[in-house]
Amino acid sequence: IALLDAAEAAGARLHFSQRLDSVDFGRRVALFVNDHDRTAQPQPFEALLGADGAGSGLREAMRPHVALVERFEPLLHGYKELEIPPAADGGFRIDPNALHIWPRGEYMCIALPNTEQTFTVTLFLPMKGERSFDALPDLAAARAFFERDFADALPLLPDFDTDWTNNPVSGLGTLHLGCWHLDGRAVLLGDAAHAMVPFHGQGMNCAFEDCLALDRHLAAAPDFETAFTGFEAERRPNAEAIQAMALENYVEMRDRVDDDDYLLQRALEQVLARRHPGHFVPRYSMVSFTCLPYATAFERGKLQREILVEATRGCRRLEDVDLAAADALVHARLPPLPAVSA
C-alpha cells in the first residue's frame, strides 16, 4: 500500500482489473481488457515497462518481434503450503524469530511466521519418485508420510487434513532470457525477465534493484533504447548470480544444515567475519544485508567457500583449525570489500 501511495503521489495513474491482451508495437498501442465486464481499453505508449511477473503478458507479446531466447528450467520439485495456527493464548506456537527447517536430504519443510501469529509451513518435495508428491495420492498417504518423516511438525498442524486437501501442489523453476528488451519500445524487469526459485528470499528485492537501475539509465541515456540496453547489461549478471545462489541455497537448506563439515565451516565463517570485517562477510549477509551487487557476492562467496573448505580439512572441531593459516588465506585470496552506495 505504501508503494502504491508513493506511486500515486509521484503522478502515476493506477488502473485495477486490467489485463494486457495484446500489443501493436508498430502503432505503439497496448490493448487492456477488464475480465470482469469484458471492456477493452486501447492505450497509446512511448515505451512499455513489463514488471508483470513470471507469466508476463508483455513478454508473450514481444516474442514474435525479438529473439528472446527463452529457456525455463523446472526444478522438478514442487511445494504445498500448510499452516500452524496461533496457540490457545493467541501467541505463536513456536519461536517467531527464526526460520524453522526440517531438512530431509532430497526434500524439506520450512516454517515462516506471519503477523497474525500463524506460520506458513511449506513442504518442498520432488514431483516424482519414491518420496514425492506423486507417491502421496491421497490424504492417508500424506498423513503417513508426515508421521514418518515430520513427526515433530505434525502436532503443530491441527488443520493438516483440511490444508492438505484444499491447497494445491505448485511448481518451481528458473527463467532465463537471452534478451530483455525490444529496441526502445519495451523492456522486462523482475520476474518477467528472470524468475527464480524462492530459496534465497530475494525475488522481490532483485526486482526493486531492477527498478533503481532502470531509473538511473533512463535519467542518463539520450533515448529509451540506449537506456534499456544499458539496464540489461548491468542487471543480467546480477540476476543470473542470484538465480544460481537461490538454487544452491535449496540444496544447502534441505541437505547440508545438519552435516558436521558444514556446521564446522559455518562456525569458522563467523570467526573469520569477526576477525576480518573488511574482507570476509558471509555470503548470505552480503546478499541480504548489504548493497553489494549479487554478482560480486556470488564470486566472493566462491572464494570464501574455498577458504573454509581448505582451512577445515581434517578438522573435527573449531579448536582444531589453524586460525593463523586461515587468516593468511583470507588476506591472500580476498581483496578488501568494495565500497557501495545504497
Residue ranges, per PLM feature:
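Charged catalytic carboxylate motif
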Residues: 2, 141, 210
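Conserved FAD-binding catalytic core of PHBH/FMO-like flavoproteins
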Residues: 5, 18-22, 27-172, 176-181
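C-terminal helical "tail/cap" subdomain of flavin- and related membrane-associated enzymes
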Residues: 216-342
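Conserved mid-domain beta->alpha element of the FAD-binding
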Residues: 49, 82, 168-258
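Active-site-adjacent segment of FAD-dependent monooxygenases/related oxidoreductases
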Residues: 1-6, 10
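General small-molecule cofactor/ligand-binding pocket signal
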Residues: 13-15
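Non-transmembrane alpha-helical segments in soluble domains
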Residues: 4, 143-147, 215, 232, ...
